[in-house]
Amino acid sequence: MTFNNKTIEELHNLLVSKEISATELTQATLENIKSREEALNSFVTIAEEQALVQAKAIDEAGIDADNVLSGIPLAVKDNISTDGILTTAASKMLYNYEPIFDATAVANAKTKGMIVVGKTNMDEFAMGGSGETSHYGATKNAWDHSKVPGGSSSGSAAAVASGQVRLSLGSDTGGSIRQPAAFNGIVGLKPTYGTVSRFGLIAFGSSLDQIGPFAPTVKENALLLNAIASEDAKDSTSAPVRIADFTSKIGQDIKGMKIALPKEYLGEGINPEVKETILNAAKHFEKLGAIVEEVSLPHSKYGVAVYYIIASSEASSNLQRFDGIRYGYRAEDATNLDEIYVNSRSQGFGEEVKRRIMLGTFSLSSGYYDAYYKKAGQVRTLIIQDFEKVFADYDLILGPTAPSVAYDLDSLNHDPVAMYLADLLTIPVNLAGLPGISIPAGFSQGLPVGLQLIGPKHSEETIYQVAAAFEATTGYHKQQPVIFGGDN
Protein backbone atom coordinates (compact mmCIF):
# COMPACT_ATOMS: atom_id res chain seq x y z
CA MET A 1 0.00 0.00 0.00
CA THR A 2 1.28 3.50 -0.85
CA PHE A 3 0.18 6.77 0.67
CA ASN A 4 2.26 9.30 -1.26
CA ASN A 5 -0.82 10.98 -2.79
CA LYS A 6 -2.43 11.57 0.60
CA THR A 7 -2.10 14.97 2.28
CA ILE A 8 -0.93 15.22 5.87
CA GLU A 9 -4.48 15.87 7.04
CA GLU A 10 -5.77 12.84 5.12
CA LEU A 11 -3.02 10.68 6.62
CA HIS A 12 -3.86 12.04 10.07
CA ASN A 13 -7.51 11.02 9.65
CA LEU A 14 -6.46 7.51 8.61
CA LEU A 15 -4.18 7.24 11.65
CA VAL A 16 -6.78 8.55 14.10
CA SER A 17 -9.47 6.22 12.73
CA LYS A 18 -6.97 3.33 12.93
CA GLU A 19 -7.44 2.48 9.27
CA ILE A 20 -3.65 2.45 9.21
CA SER A 21 -1.04 2.42 11.97
CA ALA A 22 2.07 4.58 12.29
CA THR A 23 4.10 1.43 11.70
CA GLU A 24 2.26 0.66 8.45
CA LEU A 25 2.67 4.24 7.24
CA THR A 26 6.36 4.18 8.12
CA GLN A 27 6.90 0.86 6.36
CA ALA A 28 5.13 2.17 3.25
CA THR A 29 7.27 5.31 3.33
CA LEU A 30 10.47 3.28 3.64
CA GLU A 31 9.36 1.21 0.63
CA ASN A 32 8.68 4.42 -1.32
CA ILE A 33 12.17 5.65 -0.48
CA LYS A 34 13.90 2.42 -1.50
CA SER A 35 11.95 1.99 -4.74
CA ARG A 36 12.98 5.44 -6.00
CA GLU A 37 16.43 5.70 -4.49
CA GLU A 38 18.41 4.15 -7.33
CA ALA A 39 16.99 6.74 -9.74
CA LEU A 40 17.41 9.76 -7.45
CA ASN A 41 20.16 9.19 -4.85
CA SER A 42 18.26 11.53 -2.54
CA PHE A 43 19.24 9.82 0.73
CA VAL A 44 22.58 9.33 2.44
CA THR A 45 21.13 7.20 5.25
CA ILE A 46 17.81 5.34 5.45
CA ALA A 47 17.06 5.01 9.17
CA GLU A 48 14.79 1.97 8.89
CA GLU A 49 15.46 0.39 12.27
CA GLN A 50 15.19 3.63 14.25
CA ALA A 51 12.07 4.73 12.35
CA LEU A 52 10.21 1.48 13.02
CA VAL A 53 11.12 1.64 16.72
CA GLN A 54 9.73 5.19 16.84
CA ALA A 55 6.59 4.15 14.98
CA LYS A 56 5.94 1.21 17.29
CA ALA A 57 6.25 3.47 20.33
CA ILE A 58 3.75 5.92 18.82
CA ASP A 59 1.30 3.11 18.04
CA GLU A 60 1.58 1.81 21.60
CA ALA A 61 1.03 5.28 23.07
CA GLY A 62 -1.77 6.05 20.60
CA ILE A 63 -2.03 8.70 17.90
CA ASP A 64 -2.63 12.19 19.26
CA ALA A 65 -5.92 13.19 17.65
CA ASP A 66 -5.24 16.88 18.31
CA ASN A 67 -1.82 16.81 16.65
CA VAL A 68 -1.94 16.52 12.88
CA LEU A 69 1.75 15.49 12.63
CA SER A 70 1.53 12.58 15.08
CA GLY A 71 2.84 9.46 13.33
CA ILE A 72 3.91 11.30 10.16
CA PRO A 73 7.30 10.37 8.61
CA LEU A 74 9.95 13.07 8.14
CA ALA A 75 13.19 13.18 6.14
CA VAL A 76 15.99 15.35 7.51
CA LYS A 77 18.86 17.02 5.65
CA ASP A 78 22.19 15.42 6.49
CA ASN A 79 23.65 18.54 8.13
CA ILE A 80 20.96 18.54 10.84
CA SER A 81 21.94 16.43 13.86
CA THR A 82 19.92 13.30 14.62
CA ASP A 83 20.50 11.23 17.75
CA GLY A 84 21.92 7.84 16.83
CA ILE A 85 21.68 8.41 13.06
CA LEU A 86 24.72 9.28 10.93
CA THR A 87 25.01 13.00 10.19
CA THR A 88 27.76 13.47 7.62
CA ALA A 89 26.92 16.80 5.94
CA ALA A 90 27.55 14.71 2.78
CA SER A 91 31.30 14.95 3.44
CA LYS A 92 34.10 12.43 3.74
CA MET A 93 35.24 14.56 6.69
CA LEU A 94 32.24 13.39 8.76
CA TYR A 95 31.74 9.96 7.19
CA ASN A 96 31.37 8.25 10.60
CA TYR A 97 29.83 11.02 12.75
CA GLU A 98 26.84 9.82 14.76
CA PRO A 99 25.48 12.53 17.08
CA ILE A 100 24.31 11.72 20.59
CA PHE A 101 21.66 14.43 20.48
CA ASP A 102 18.94 15.80 18.22
CA ALA A 103 19.01 19.27 16.72
CA THR A 104 16.31 21.38 18.36
CA ALA A 105 14.25 21.38 15.14
CA VAL A 106 14.34 17.57 15.05
CA ALA A 107 13.58 17.31 18.77
CA ASN A 108 10.58 19.61 18.27
CA ALA A 109 9.33 17.47 15.37
CA LYS A 110 9.71 14.30 17.43
CA THR A 111 7.82 15.92 20.30
CA LYS A 112 4.94 16.33 17.84
CA GLY A 113 5.17 12.61 17.10
CA MET A 114 7.02 12.79 13.79
CA ILE A 115 9.13 9.82 12.72
CA VAL A 116 12.61 10.38 11.22
CA VAL A 117 12.96 7.95 8.30
CA GLY A 118 16.34 9.06 6.98
CA LYS A 119 18.96 11.68 6.18
CA THR A 120 18.85 13.35 2.79
CA ASN A 121 21.70 13.97 0.38
CA MET A 122 23.04 17.49 -0.06
CA ASP A 123 25.92 19.55 -1.35
CA GLU A 124 28.90 18.98 0.94
CA PHE A 125 28.61 21.14 4.07
CA ALA A 126 25.74 22.90 2.24
CA MET A 127 28.23 24.48 -0.17
CA GLY A 128 26.83 24.23 -3.68
CA GLY A 129 23.73 25.01 -5.68
CA SER A 130 23.27 21.86 -7.72
CA GLY A 131 23.39 18.84 -5.40
CA GLU A 132 26.58 17.66 -7.11
CA THR A 133 29.28 18.33 -4.49
CA SER A 134 28.15 15.51 -2.18
CA HIS A 135 30.78 12.91 -1.25
CA TYR A 136 28.01 10.35 -1.85
CA GLY A 137 27.27 11.36 -5.43
CA ALA A 138 24.87 13.76 -7.10
CA THR A 139 21.13 13.77 -6.43
CA LYS A 140 18.93 13.78 -9.54
CA ASN A 141 16.00 16.07 -10.34
CA ALA A 142 12.64 14.40 -9.72
CA TRP A 143 11.25 15.64 -13.07
CA ASP A 144 14.22 14.82 -15.28
CA HIS A 145 17.06 12.66 -13.99
CA SER A 146 19.52 14.30 -16.39
CA LYS A 147 18.98 17.66 -14.62
CA VAL A 148 20.24 19.00 -11.31
CA PRO A 149 17.78 19.11 -8.39
CA GLY A 150 19.23 22.37 -7.09
CA GLY A 151 21.09 22.73 -3.84
CA SER A 152 22.24 22.54 -1.30
CA SER A 153 19.11 20.78 0.06
CA SER A 154 18.98 18.58 -3.03
CA GLY A 155 17.82 15.33 -1.44
CA SER A 156 15.19 16.95 0.76
CA ALA A 157 13.53 18.55 -2.28
CA ALA A 158 13.82 15.54 -4.59
CA ALA A 159 12.46 13.22 -1.88
CA VAL A 160 9.27 15.28 -1.49
CA ALA A 161 8.81 15.92 -5.22
CA SER A 162 9.19 12.23 -6.08
CA GLY A 163 6.82 10.97 -3.39
CA GLN A 164 9.49 9.29 -1.27
CA VAL A 165 8.28 11.34 1.71
CA ARG A 166 5.58 13.95 2.23
CA LEU A 167 7.63 16.29 4.42
CA SER A 168 11.32 17.08 4.85
CA LEU A 169 13.67 19.54 6.51
CA GLY A 170 16.37 21.52 4.74
CA SER A 171 18.63 24.45 5.52
CA ASP A 172 18.97 27.71 3.61
CA THR A 173 22.11 29.87 3.67
CA GLY A 174 21.79 31.56 0.27
CA GLY A 175 18.81 29.86 -1.32
CA SER A 176 19.36 26.22 -0.41
CA ILE A 177 15.68 25.53 0.35
CA ARG A 178 14.00 27.81 -2.17
CA GLN A 179 16.09 27.00 -5.25
CA PRO A 180 15.72 23.19 -5.05
CA ALA A 181 12.03 23.67 -4.23
CA ALA A 182 11.72 25.68 -7.46
CA PHE A 183 13.68 23.14 -9.54
CA ASN A 184 11.51 20.27 -8.24
CA GLY A 185 8.12 21.99 -8.30
CA ILE A 186 7.32 21.93 -4.57
CA VAL A 187 6.93 24.41 -1.71
CA GLY A 188 10.02 25.43 0.27
CA LEU A 189 10.21 28.14 2.92
CA LYS A 190 13.22 29.90 4.39
CA PRO A 191 11.92 31.36 7.69
CA THR A 192 12.90 34.66 9.26
CA TYR A 193 16.41 34.36 10.73
CA GLY A 194 16.04 33.07 14.29
CA THR A 195 12.56 31.55 13.89
CA VAL A 196 13.93 27.99 13.88
CA SER A 197 16.80 27.17 16.22
CA ARG A 198 20.19 26.52 14.61
CA PHE A 199 21.26 24.31 17.54
CA GLY A 200 22.38 21.02 16.03
CA LEU A 201 22.75 22.42 12.51
CA ILE A 202 26.30 21.91 11.25
CA ALA A 203 27.28 25.52 10.69
CA PHE A 204 28.20 27.01 7.30
CA GLY A 205 27.45 30.75 7.51
CA SER A 206 26.19 31.41 11.02
CA SER A 207 24.64 34.82 10.28
CA LEU A 208 22.81 33.37 7.26
CA ASP A 209 21.85 29.75 8.05
CA GLN A 210 18.22 28.86 8.75
CA ILE A 211 16.42 25.50 8.90
CA GLY A 212 13.10 25.31 7.06
CA PRO A 213 10.39 23.00 5.67
CA PHE A 214 9.67 21.33 2.32
CA ALA A 215 6.19 20.06 1.39
CA PRO A 216 4.02 19.50 -1.69
CA THR A 217 1.52 22.21 -0.65
CA VAL A 218 1.53 25.53 1.18
CA LYS A 219 -0.59 24.36 4.11
CA GLU A 220 1.50 21.26 4.72
CA ASN A 221 4.61 23.42 4.66
CA ALA A 222 3.07 25.71 7.30
CA LEU A 223 2.09 22.73 9.46
CA LEU A 224 5.71 21.57 9.54
CA LEU A 225 6.92 25.08 10.40
CA ASN A 226 4.43 25.07 13.30
CA ALA A 227 6.20 21.98 14.62
CA ILE A 228 9.82 23.11 14.34
CA ALA A 229 9.69 26.84 15.17
CA SER A 230 10.67 27.72 18.74
CA GLU A 231 12.79 30.03 20.80
CA ASP A 232 15.81 28.14 22.09
CA ALA A 233 18.26 29.05 24.85
CA LYS A 234 20.83 26.84 23.08
CA ASP A 235 20.86 29.23 20.10
CA SER A 236 21.72 32.80 21.07
CA THR A 237 20.29 34.09 17.77
CA SER A 238 16.89 32.44 18.12
CA ALA A 239 13.91 34.76 18.44
CA PRO A 240 10.60 34.43 20.30
CA VAL A 241 7.94 32.81 18.11
CA ARG A 242 5.50 35.62 17.39
CA ILE A 243 3.01 33.53 15.42
CA ALA A 244 0.99 30.86 17.24
CA ASP A 245 -0.24 29.14 14.07
CA PHE A 246 1.41 29.71 10.70
CA THR A 247 -1.70 28.35 8.92
CA SER A 248 -4.06 30.92 10.47
CA LYS A 249 -4.39 33.16 7.39
CA ILE A 250 -4.49 30.40 4.78
CA GLY A 251 -7.79 30.63 2.90
CA GLN A 252 -8.23 34.37 3.43
CA ASP A 253 -8.48 36.52 0.30
CA ILE A 254 -5.70 38.92 -0.68
CA LYS A 255 -7.78 41.84 -1.96
CA GLY A 256 -6.02 45.16 -1.46
CA MET A 257 -2.63 43.65 -0.68
CA LYS A 258 0.29 45.52 -2.19
CA ILE A 259 2.90 43.36 -3.87
CA ALA A 260 6.19 44.78 -5.17
CA LEU A 261 7.87 43.47 -8.32
CA PRO A 262 11.55 44.58 -8.40
CA LYS A 263 12.77 45.45 -11.89
CA GLU A 264 16.16 43.96 -11.00
CA TYR A 265 14.52 40.52 -10.58
CA LEU A 266 13.41 40.46 -14.23
CA GLY A 267 16.49 41.97 -15.84
CA GLU A 268 19.66 40.66 -17.40
CA GLY A 269 20.37 36.96 -16.91
CA ILE A 270 16.75 35.89 -16.36
CA ASN A 271 15.48 33.22 -18.75
CA PRO A 272 12.74 34.73 -20.98
CA GLU A 273 10.27 31.92 -20.22
CA VAL A 274 10.89 32.29 -16.48
CA LYS A 275 10.31 36.05 -16.82
CA GLU A 276 7.07 35.46 -18.72
CA THR A 277 5.89 33.01 -16.04
CA ILE A 278 6.45 35.56 -13.28
CA LEU A 279 4.73 38.35 -15.22
CA ASN A 280 1.76 36.03 -15.74
CA ALA A 281 1.77 35.30 -12.01
CA ALA A 282 1.73 39.04 -11.31
CA LYS A 283 -1.37 39.38 -13.51
CA HIS A 284 -2.95 36.48 -11.64
CA PHE A 285 -2.37 38.19 -8.30
CA GLU A 286 -4.06 41.28 -9.72
CA LYS A 287 -7.07 39.16 -10.71
CA LEU A 288 -7.21 38.02 -7.09
CA GLY A 289 -7.47 41.65 -6.00
CA ALA A 290 -3.86 42.44 -5.12
CA ILE A 291 -2.05 45.55 -6.33
CA VAL A 292 1.23 44.73 -8.10
CA GLU A 293 3.67 47.56 -8.81
CA GLU A 294 7.24 47.78 -10.06
CA VAL A 295 9.90 48.86 -7.54
CA SER A 296 13.69 48.95 -7.37
CA LEU A 297 16.15 47.13 -5.12
CA PRO A 298 19.26 48.88 -6.45
CA HIS A 299 21.87 47.14 -4.32
CA SER A 300 20.61 43.59 -4.94
CA LYS A 301 23.04 43.30 -7.87
CA TYR A 302 25.88 43.22 -5.33
CA GLY A 303 24.28 40.39 -3.34
CA VAL A 304 26.27 37.50 -4.81
CA ALA A 305 29.63 39.23 -4.28
CA VAL A 306 28.72 40.24 -0.72
CA TYR A 307 27.41 36.77 0.07
CA TYR A 308 30.47 34.88 -1.12
CA ILE A 309 32.75 37.05 1.00
CA ILE A 310 30.63 36.88 4.16
CA ALA A 311 29.52 33.24 3.86
CA SER A 312 32.99 32.01 2.93
CA SER A 313 34.56 33.97 5.79
CA GLU A 314 32.12 32.45 8.27
CA ALA A 315 32.69 29.00 6.76
CA SER A 316 36.46 29.43 7.07
CA SER A 317 35.98 29.99 10.80
CA ASN A 318 33.28 27.34 11.35
CA LEU A 319 35.17 24.59 9.54
CA GLN A 320 38.43 25.10 11.44
CA ARG A 321 37.24 22.51 13.97
CA PHE A 322 37.46 19.72 11.38
CA ASP A 323 41.17 18.99 11.59
CA GLY A 324 41.59 15.23 12.03
CA ILE A 325 42.28 15.67 15.75
CA ARG A 326 39.13 16.93 17.43
CA TYR A 327 36.61 16.04 14.74
CA GLY A 328 36.31 14.13 11.55
CA TYR A 329 38.32 12.10 9.10
CA ARG A 330 42.01 11.58 9.92
CA ALA A 331 44.52 10.97 7.14
CA GLU A 332 46.49 7.75 7.50
CA ASP A 333 49.54 8.94 5.56
CA ALA A 334 50.62 11.61 8.08
CA THR A 335 53.95 11.31 9.90
CA ASN A 336 53.71 14.37 12.16
CA LEU A 337 51.14 16.78 13.61
CA ASP A 338 51.34 19.29 10.77
CA GLU A 339 50.75 16.55 8.22
CA ILE A 340 47.73 15.28 10.17
CA TYR A 341 46.15 18.73 9.89
CA VAL A 342 47.09 19.34 6.26
CA ASN A 343 46.43 15.85 4.89
CA SER A 344 43.21 15.31 6.82
CA ARG A 345 41.69 18.56 5.58
CA SER A 346 43.03 18.13 2.04
CA GLN A 347 41.61 14.62 1.77
CA GLY A 348 38.49 15.10 3.91
CA PHE A 349 37.07 18.19 2.20
CA GLY A 350 35.85 18.31 -1.40
CA GLU A 351 36.98 20.87 -3.96
CA GLU A 352 34.11 23.34 -3.48
CA VAL A 353 34.50 23.36 0.31
CA LYS A 354 38.25 23.96 0.00
CA ARG A 355 37.60 26.75 -2.52
CA ARG A 356 35.30 28.57 -0.09
CA ILE A 357 37.60 28.06 2.89
CA MET A 358 40.44 29.61 0.89
CA LEU A 359 38.27 32.53 -0.23
CA GLY A 360 37.09 33.15 3.34
CA THR A 361 40.56 32.90 4.83
CA PHE A 362 41.85 35.37 2.25
CA SER A 363 38.99 37.81 2.95
CA LEU A 364 39.76 37.76 6.68
CA SER A 365 43.53 37.97 6.36
CA SER A 366 45.60 40.94 7.47
CA GLY A 367 45.72 43.63 4.82
CA TYR A 368 42.57 42.44 3.04
CA TYR A 369 39.95 42.53 5.82
CA ASP A 370 38.94 46.16 5.22
CA ALA A 371 38.89 45.79 1.45
CA TYR A 372 36.74 42.66 1.46
CA TYR A 373 34.98 41.54 4.65
CA LYS A 374 34.38 44.99 6.12
CA LYS A 375 33.23 46.37 2.76
CA ALA A 376 30.90 43.40 2.27
CA GLY A 377 29.32 44.11 5.65
CA GLN A 378 28.70 47.72 4.66
CA VAL A 379 27.04 46.74 1.37
CA ARG A 380 24.97 44.15 3.25
CA THR A 381 23.52 47.03 5.26
CA LEU A 382 22.57 48.83 2.04
CA ILE A 383 20.78 45.70 0.80
CA ILE A 384 18.85 45.51 4.09
CA GLN A 385 17.90 49.19 3.78
CA ASP A 386 16.60 48.61 0.23
CA PHE A 387 14.21 45.98 1.55
CA GLU A 388 13.12 48.20 4.45
CA LYS A 389 12.22 51.02 2.05
CA VAL A 390 10.08 48.70 -0.08
CA PHE A 391 8.34 47.13 2.92
CA ALA A 392 7.38 50.57 4.19
CA ASP A 393 4.86 50.66 1.31
CA TYR A 394 4.30 47.03 0.30
CA ASP A 395 3.22 43.80 2.00
CA LEU A 396 5.36 41.39 -0.03
CA ILE A 397 7.89 41.21 -2.85
CA LEU A 398 7.33 38.95 -5.86
CA GLY A 399 9.91 37.54 -8.24
CA PRO A 400 11.38 34.37 -9.72
CA THR A 401 13.12 31.98 -7.33
CA ALA A 402 15.89 31.22 -9.82
CA PRO A 403 17.01 32.79 -13.12
CA SER A 404 16.33 29.54 -15.00
CA VAL A 405 14.79 26.11 -14.67
CA ALA A 406 16.94 23.13 -13.67
CA TYR A 407 20.02 22.75 -15.89
CA ASP A 408 21.98 19.70 -17.01
CA LEU A 409 24.01 17.70 -14.53
CA ASP A 410 27.74 18.46 -14.76
CA SER A 411 27.13 21.55 -16.92
CA LEU A 412 28.31 24.21 -14.43
CA ASN A 413 30.72 22.18 -12.27
CA HIS A 414 33.74 23.70 -13.97
CA ASP A 415 32.42 27.28 -13.79
CA PRO A 416 32.01 28.23 -10.11
CA VAL A 417 31.00 31.82 -10.89
CA ALA A 418 28.13 30.70 -13.13
CA MET A 419 27.02 28.34 -10.37
CA TYR A 420 27.14 31.15 -7.81
CA LEU A 421 25.08 33.46 -10.05
CA ALA A 422 22.25 30.91 -10.05
CA ASP A 423 21.52 32.09 -6.48
CA LEU A 424 21.38 35.80 -7.30
CA LEU A 425 17.62 36.07 -6.57
CA THR A 426 17.65 34.17 -3.27
CA ILE A 427 20.85 35.44 -1.64
CA PRO A 428 19.62 38.95 -0.71
CA VAL A 429 16.86 37.40 1.44
CA ASN A 430 19.46 35.63 3.61
CA LEU A 431 21.64 38.72 3.84
CA ALA A 432 18.64 40.62 5.24
CA GLY A 433 17.39 37.79 7.47
CA LEU A 434 13.96 37.83 5.81
CA PRO A 435 11.45 35.02 5.18
CA GLY A 436 10.99 33.80 1.63
CA ILE A 437 9.00 31.02 -0.02
CA SER A 438 9.19 29.27 -3.38
CA ILE A 439 5.99 27.85 -4.86
CA PRO A 440 5.29 26.24 -8.26
CA ALA A 441 4.21 28.84 -10.83
CA GLY A 442 4.31 27.02 -14.15
CA PHE A 443 6.59 25.08 -16.47
CA SER A 444 9.27 25.78 -19.04
CA GLN A 445 10.69 23.03 -21.27
CA GLY A 446 8.75 20.53 -19.17
CA LEU A 447 10.47 21.64 -15.95
CA PRO A 448 8.96 23.52 -13.00
CA VAL A 449 9.37 27.28 -12.58
CA GLY A 450 9.43 28.62 -9.03
CA LEU A 451 7.85 31.87 -7.86
CA GLN A 452 9.40 33.56 -4.82
CA LEU A 453 7.48 35.63 -2.28
CA ILE A 454 9.54 37.66 0.20
CA GLY A 455 8.18 39.41 3.26
CA PRO A 456 9.41 41.59 6.12
CA LYS A 457 10.67 39.80 9.22
CA HIS A 458 8.10 37.57 10.95
CA SER A 459 5.58 37.81 8.10
CA GLU A 460 5.35 34.07 7.42
CA GLU A 461 1.58 34.10 8.05
CA THR A 462 1.10 36.64 5.26
CA ILE A 463 3.49 34.83 2.93
CA TYR A 464 1.54 31.60 3.41
CA GLN A 465 -1.76 33.46 2.90
CA VAL A 466 -0.70 34.89 -0.47
CA ALA A 467 1.07 31.69 -1.57
CA ALA A 468 -2.01 29.61 -0.73
CA ALA A 469 -4.28 31.98 -2.67
CA PHE A 470 -2.10 31.52 -5.76
CA GLU A 471 -1.88 27.75 -5.25
CA ALA A 472 -5.64 27.31 -4.82
CA THR A 473 -6.46 29.20 -8.02
CA THR A 474 -3.78 27.76 -10.31
CA GLY A 475 -3.24 24.10 -9.45
CA TYR A 476 0.41 23.81 -10.50
CA HIS A 477 1.12 21.90 -7.28
CA LYS A 478 -1.13 19.08 -8.51
CA GLN A 479 1.19 18.24 -11.41
CA GLN A 480 3.64 15.51 -10.50
CA PRO A 481 6.72 13.98 -12.10
CA VAL A 482 6.56 10.53 -13.68
CA ILE A 483 8.53 8.99 -10.80
CA PHE A 484 5.79 10.10 -8.39
CA GLY A 485 3.13 8.42 -10.48
CA GLY A 486 1.74 11.58 -12.08
CA ASP A 487 1.88 12.85 -15.65
CA ASN A 488 5.05 14.62 -16.72
Curated annotation (Swiss-Prot):
The gene is gatA. It is an enzyme of class 6 (ligase). Allows the formation of correctly charged Gln-tRNA(Gln) through the transamidation of misacylated Glu-tRNA(Gln) in organisms which lack glutaminyl-tRNA synthetase. The reaction takes place in the presence of glutamine and ATP through an activated gamma-phospho-Glu-tRNA(Gln). Coiled coil: none annotated. The keyword Protein biosynthesis applies. Gene3D superfamilies: Amidase signature (AS) domain. Transmembrane segments: none annotated. It comes from Streptococcus pneumoniae (strain Taiwan19F-14). One of its GO terms (biological process) is translation. Keywords: ATP-binding, Ligase, Nucleotide-binding, Protein biosynthesis. This is Glutamyl-tRNA(Gln) amidotransferase subunit A. It comes from the Bacteria.
